[in-house]
Amino acid sequence: MKTLGIETSCDETAIAIYDCEEGIIGESIHSQIEMHAEYGGVVPELASRDHCSKIVEVLNNALDDIPLESIDKIAYTSGPGLLGALLIGESFAQGLSTALNIPLIPVNHLEGHLMSPMMEFSELQMPFICLLVSGGHSMIAVSYTHLRAHETMAH
């Protein structure tokens, strides 16, 4: 089972392919850090335009020699994040999902961070406590199950 993940919530365009048996088998990231540096922070309109111009290249780099038709489902960041940037990722994911006739899974950016340890440490037992620091979001949370059952203890 292969999942293609798309992340465009702020200033990085990232795509990875995750295989349930092999782990990450393809990935590519395009960073906008240098582009925004002269402004002292992320400019949302510039971020959106850059996602638009780079997302196909990032997909091709992530796929490398993995056939697009071998992808079983597509996950994408649905928020929180910059609205325009999120819409680029969602629209791209919807187009691929429709073209390939495969499921589309919206993923909350923060929940993605909370559950990411499970990719590396599959033996991790629930519940577990997470410290999350991501952009403007910081929190301590308890993750109870894989089914979006998280409790924020502090933020």
Where do the protein language model's features map onto the residues?
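Short Gly/Thr/Asp-enriched flexible loops that form oxyanion-binding sites at enzyme active sites
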Residues: 76-100
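Conserved small/polar residues in nucleotide/adenosyl-binding loops
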Residues: 145-154
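Short glycine-aspartate micro-motif
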Residues: 3-5, 73-75, 85, 128-132
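Short beta-strand scaffold segments in enzyme catalytic cores
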Residues: 13-18, 130, 138-142
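N-terminal beta-alpha supersecondary unit
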Residues: 2-70, 76-80, 109, 113
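Flexible, glycine/proline-enriched loop segments at strand-loop-helix junctions
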Residues: 82-84, 102, 128, 147-148
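Conserved phosphate-binding catalytic cores of ATP/NTP-utilizing and phosphoryl-transfer enzymes
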Residues: 102, 106-129
